[in-house]
Amino acid sequence: MLFRSNWHAGAKAPEKILTVHSIGDVPSGWFCPSDPGLYRNMLRALHNAIGKYDLEGWTACTEATHWSGMLYDNDPAMLAACPVPQYDIEIGSSPVSWTDPEAAKAVADALVHVFDDDTRPKVVLACGGVHFESAFSNCGLQDEYPVMCAHILPNQWMVSGQYTGAEGLAKLKAAAAAIPGGIDAISFHDNQAAPYKDVCRQLAAELNIPIFKHRTLRDPAKLRAAMEQK
């Protein structure tokens, strides 16, 4: 298990956030392992630490799966050489937030709680949506029905990576295979074009698992019903 602590920035990035995200290069289809239970524990530990350190206005959230090595022209194939789950934990998204000592304490505090719960949640491969999609974060934070989106493939990178046809199916399979124990369901976004939804449906059919719209993740009761459909 490997965590890297970092800072987050971006033109449209939200402020006062503690984020955690799985590692992978979605366009090329290379992914590090992602343990859904430990990923969920880390997200929830960040959420709890916000309250503990009285970080008013802060939010704990996930981000889309990505790898900062692409910014430096590194080969994404090297991700296959790491056999253990990897995650980035980040404070965002401005110098004011990066230098907040209480935020740094919250991250440090959260790290020691990553192994507190050995529950394996139901596992979703999340396809489509935007980089910060609240439905993906909130389903991991709710207590009613333990679920985690172990890899999150946003729409823009599925498009740039041509996640259609045989090539797209192979990349989706690579994302699913990078999750120890496999996946229990696939979610897709309403705004995805038909060819991208089709390849998600194809993988769900091959794995004999449910597939549903991402909005289902917002309601634990509907999520349970969707996850348990046969």
Features from the language model and the residues they span:
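Short acidic, S/G/P-rich loop/turn micro-motifs used as interaction or catalytic elements
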Residues: A9-G10, V96, N191-Y196
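A short, glycine/acidic-enriched catalytic loop
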Residues: G10-S34, D143-Q162
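Intrinsically disordered, low-complexity linker/loop segments enriched in Gly/Pro
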Residues: I17-D75
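Generic non-transmembrane alpha-helical segments
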Residues: L38-Y53, A106-D117, L203
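Active-site-adjacent mobile loop/cap segments within catalytic or ligand-binding domains
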Residues: C61-D118
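Acidic, Ser/Thr-rich low-complexity intrinsically disordered segments
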Residues: P121-N191
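C-terminal accessory extensions appended to soluble enzyme cores
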Residues: P180, P195-K230
